[in-house]
From Swiss-Prot:
Cysteines paired by S-S bonds: none
Source organism superkingdom: Archaea
Broadest EC class assigned to this enzyme: transferase
Primary residence: cytoplasm
GO terms under biological process: DNA-templated transcription
Lineage: Archaea, Methanobacteriati, Methanobacteriota, Thermococci, Thermococcales
Requisite cofactors: Zn(2+)
Subunit structure: Part of the RNA polymerase complex.
Organism of derivation: Pyrococcus horikoshii (strain ATCC 700860 / DSM 12428 / JCM 9974 / NBRC 100139 / OT-3)
Cofactor binding, per record: Binds 1 zinc ion.
Identification of the protein by name: DNA-directed RNA polymerase subunit Rpo10
Gene that specifies this protein: rpo10
Keywords associated with the record: Cytoplasm, DNA-directed RNA polymerase, Metal-binding, Nucleotidyltransferase, Transcription, Transferase, Zinc
Length: 65
């Protein structure tokens, strides 16, 4: 849904890196190189960005009661 601000495992701040990661990967760069450039070396932080799925736009169509 919404990218978490911190890594669930180690607590490192990762929320500020998501849009840069997304932009560069969509431009055709290798995700491994992008994560290295962003300073995400721990596999727990890397999985947070690699496995994230944007669902907020789909969920907003439903009403909350």
């Amino acid at each position: 849904m919404i990218i978490p601000v911190r890594c669930f495992t180690c607590g490192k701040v990762i929320g500020d890196k998501y849009y840069e990661f997304k932009r560069r990967v969509e431009a055709g760069e290798d995700p491994e190189k992008v994560l290295d450039d962003l300073g995400l070396e721990r596999y727990c932080c890397r999985r947070m960005l690699l496995s994230h799925v944007e669902l907020i736009d789909d969920i907003m169509h439903y009403k909350v009661y």
